[in-house]
Amino acid sequence: VQFSTFLSDRQHFHAPRQIVFDAFTKPELVRRWLLGPPGWTMPVCEIDLRVGGAYRYVWRRESPGTEMGMGGVFREIVSPERLVATEKFDDAWYPGEALDTTVFVEDGEITRTTITVLYGSQEARDIASRSGMETGMAAGYDRLEELLSQMLTEKAQ
């Protein structure tokens, strides 16, 4: 869904909200699912989960030797309900900085997430929406669902 300078994405996961929140905020979990399409790894995943704390992700694809990095600063953290952080890619493929807001809502045995990205301009939003990021996001969300299932199985044992 697109509105002016926003992009929004909604997902649902079959896991309690706290576990989903942890999967978005703990480096040892994030690096297991936030990888994009097959062939990418995440050699750098640093998260200082506090207001004013920074995060840094670097993805690498061995063939053809591509690397992509991004980072930002946490502006608001309400565990396990809401995260607000800035976002800026190293290669600045869209102008300026974006502001990401992720909301986690528990609905029975499902957690619904809404990620809203506010770009500095409609141009930046348009560049991001044409980037093909949906493919990488879909692959990541599939991995996240698998990870959450594994975590719930381990917790039940």
Regions found by a protein language model. Name each.
Residues 148-157:
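Short, highly charged C-terminal tails/helix-capping segments
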Residues 20-21, 30, 55-57, 74, ...:
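Hydrophobic pocket/interface hotspot
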Residues 17-18, 48-50, 75-82, 103-112:
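A short, structured loop/turn motif at beta-sheet edges
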Residues 8, 42, 67-71, 95-100:
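Short, surface-exposed coil-to-beta transition loops
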Residues 1-40:
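Hydrophobic ligand-binding cavity/cleft-lining segments
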